[in-house]
Each structure stands twice: as structure tokens, then as C-alpha cells.
Amino acid sequence: MLMSIVLFAIGLVLLIKGGDWFVDGATGIAKRFNLPDIVVGATVVSIGTTLPEVMVSTTGALQGSGAMAYGNAIGSIICNTALIAAISIVCNPGPVNTKSMKTPAIFFFASAGLYCLASYVLGTFPRWMGFVMLSIFVVYMVLTVRNGMKNPDEAEHEEEEEGKQRTLLMELALLVVGAAVIAVGADLLVEHGQIIAIGLGVPETVVALLFVALGTSLPELVTTITSLRSGHASLGVGNVIGANVFNLVLVSGVAVSLAPFDVPCENFLLDTGLNMSLVFEIPVMLGVMSLMIFPTLASKKLARWQGLLLLGIYIAFCVCQFVL
């Protein structure tokens, strides 16, 4: 199993590095067409940083591991919110522009409702639901770009990189190589994640919820740290909410459209026979998002107690995966 752990770690590194190359190449190409920064940021960069999750979930679904696809989406949302956003809130609480949070919050809970329909009522994620998720994603992207064009001051402005001097051929190479590296990393992650799960005697869902989710959430962690250093903690939190929408409608949408899967039934709450995904994991996902969003919208500020409570929930969530 040691070799599988090493290859799993290599897969994570390839995912992250491949994502960086893909974003650099795609951003460079997009800017050659003089697209506004907000359009580039809301489309190319956002999709590029979510590509690792897309590839992992899609690879898992195509290989018959619905648990990996399912767990990665939910786990990434919990990790983004209760760990990454929580760190940002604890380090830099204060007033926040709630107007920019409303649209992604509405889309998140609407998409979560669709997710709950599949999980609690249907017991499966049919292909038509994948198409609906992708349709929601398109609408969300259009509204995000329109809002950014109307309110350019609220948009995130990326610093110009030295890479601007790259040739078109180099940018195309970064795009293609980045996508290929992500694909290889995703394959390693899924294959050896399954082996590690068997070796540890835990369901694949646990590996996806904790280790895979944390690894694929590292780009959001980097964004949050950058926002903290520049004194824009609320920007980091906004990026997290947007990333969570992507996890529900883009990551799950692509995976379900290509390879529909059933809700995993391999992990049960103690000896009750209750599916952990339904009675624990989805409620935690909805709970941490509610804890981050609703008090903030009501008070128009991020409070340190929110961050501390979210961190406590994340630690408890991780422990419970091995105890319950």
C-alpha cells in the first residue's frame, strides 16, 4: 500500500501543477483576443481551477467508482467552507460586500436542492440530471459575467504575470500539456485512492471526502491565502462560494452526464443501517454553507466565531469518518 500512497501523492501534485499550466495557457490565449479581465477570470480561470475536481469525479464515474465522484464533490464543498473559508474568516473577520454573495448563494442552494432530490428521492444521478446541472452552470456563468461587467470595481483583478511574454505556441502547449497532466493525475488519484481505501478498510467515499477533496481544494486555499495577504478576506470567501457552486453543477454535471451513478451505499452510521451520505455528509455540507452565508448576509460582516465554529465542525467531520 506504500507505493499506492506515493502514487496517490504524485497524482495530487500532477493535478495541481497541471491545473496551473492549463490556467496559464488558457488565460494567455483568452487575453490575446482582448477579452475583459472579468470575463477571463469568471470563465477561463474559474473553470481551470475546478478542472482537477472535474477530472477526478469524471474518471471515478467512468471507472465505475460513483463513490469517488460523489464523495469528491461533497468533500470539496465541506473542505472549501469549513477549512479554507474558515481560516480566512478567523484571520481577518470584518465587514463584507454581501451583494456579491447573493447570486452564488442562491445558485448554490438551488443546486443543492437538485442534489438532494437525486440523493433522497431518486437514489441515483440519472443522465438527464447531469444535463440540468450543466444548464444551471451556463446560466450562472452568464449572470456572473454580466454582473462583473456592470460592477467592474467588485471584480477580482489578477496581477499581470511575466508569462505575458509567452508566444501563442507556448500558451497552446501549456493548455494541452496541462490538460494531459491533469488527466494522468486524476487517473492515479482514483486508481490508488481505491487501493488505499481497501488497505485501510474504509469505504472509497471516505478517501474521496477527506484526502481527494483536500488535495483538489488546494487551488482555493492558495487563492484564499493570497486574498488574506492583500487584505481582501471577503474576496477569498466569495471565491469559495463560487467554487462550491462549480462543484455541484460543473463537477457533478460533467461526471453524471458522461457516466450516471447511484448514491453510494457502502458507509453506514454505526450499526443503524443508515446511509452516512444521507444522514451525515449532505447535512454537514448544507450546514457549513448555511453557517457561513446566512449570518453574514444578516449582519453584513464575517465574524470570527463563524470561522472558529466551522473549523471545529471540520475537525469533528474528519474524526467521525473513521469513528462512526
Sequence positions of predicted segments:
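Hydrophobic alpha-helical segments, chiefly the membrane-spanning helices
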Residues: 1-324
